[in-house]
Amino acid sequence: MNLYLIFLIVVGVVGLVLVGLFLSFFSVWLRALLAGAPVSPFNLVAMRLRQVPYSVMVDARIRATKAGIKLSIDEIEAQYLAGGNVIACVHALIAAQKARIALDWQRACAIDLATKGSGKSVEEAVRTSVDPKVIDCPNPESGRTTIDGVAKDGIQVKVKARVTVRTNLDRFVGGAKEETIIARVGEGIVSTIGSAESYKVVLESPDAISKTVLHRGLDVGSAFEILSIDIADVDVGENVGAKLQEAQAQANKSIAQAQAEIRRAAAVALEQEMVARVQEMQAKVVEAQSQVPLAMAEAFRSGRLGVMDYFRMENIQGDTAMRNSLARPEDKKQ
């Protein structure tokens, strides 16, 4: 009796599970049929076995069908298995169709997979293509608030720009993103300011910057099409030219001081060398003077010098010393 009761309980539980599954499949199948997007029950069972949320797949197909877009359940399931967001892809297709933008399922799936994990989505790409977005240049998140350029007269000009772009769906996959647009526009603005003869030219016609930059085709190879570049603010910065001249003058001054110090050191060294040479010459004079008495003694012995000659020489030396003392009286005062 107990085994029979257990058997009935098991059969009842299995029956309830089967009925629940049947009702689940039946409700989805019926919803698709009534919406004009019929799905085979075998496809529903197969998706269940593949752990695919068949209800989401059917809902996506119903939305596409109601919008007049023909999609098979296999195409939707393939995008899901590839890791895409099928609902977002369908919404993007519907938005593109309403805006009369050429976008097919394959391209929408490619954009969806390309933007996965980047914070973007295929819906945003289509939305930007329909409703252009404005990009601040430079990006405030970069820490810079202005794009700085220097005119030919050395005056710095600070510029804020706003770039209006529209998504180019044909180049969205593999195309350069917003960072590249900001970098290119910044480079163009700096180049345009640098080619101006004076900062006054930039202040008088800031629209010339946007026109010049816009004509350079900065959106080539990017995922966006630049519609306009507007100069939001122009300010005068520092006199960079004067600062550079001041720095150059300071550098020249330092170089001149170093060269003067080198020449002074060379002069001091030469002076010391001359002092040493004078001392050397004086030593030679003293040495020569010390040889005079010896030579006189030798002259006396050999008879080449007489006594009268000696006294005459002494008198001459005395007269010479007296004349020298008379010629330099200041030496006596000292």
Curated annotation (Swiss-Prot):
Main location: membrane
Alphabetically ordered keywords of this record: Cell membrane, Membrane, Transmembrane, Transmembrane helix
InterPro entries in alphabetical order: FloA (IPR022853)
CC terms in the record's Gene Ontology section: membrane raft; plasma membrane
Keyword Transmembrane appears in the UniProt entry: yes
UniProt membrane topology term: Single-pass membrane protein
Compartments it resides in: Cell membrane; Membrane raft
Entry's transmembrane regions: 3-23
Source organism superkingdom: Bacteria
Function field: Found in functional membrane microdomains (FMM) that may be equivalent to eukaryotic membrane rafts. FMMs are highly dynamic and increase in number as cells age. Flotillins are thought to be important factors in membrane fluidity.
Family the UniProt entry places it in: Belongs to the flotillin-like FloA family.
Assembly information from the UniProt record: Homooligomerizes.
The protein's name: Flotillin-like protein FloA
Organism this protein belongs to: Opitutus terrae (strain DSM 11246 / JCM 15787 / PB90-1)
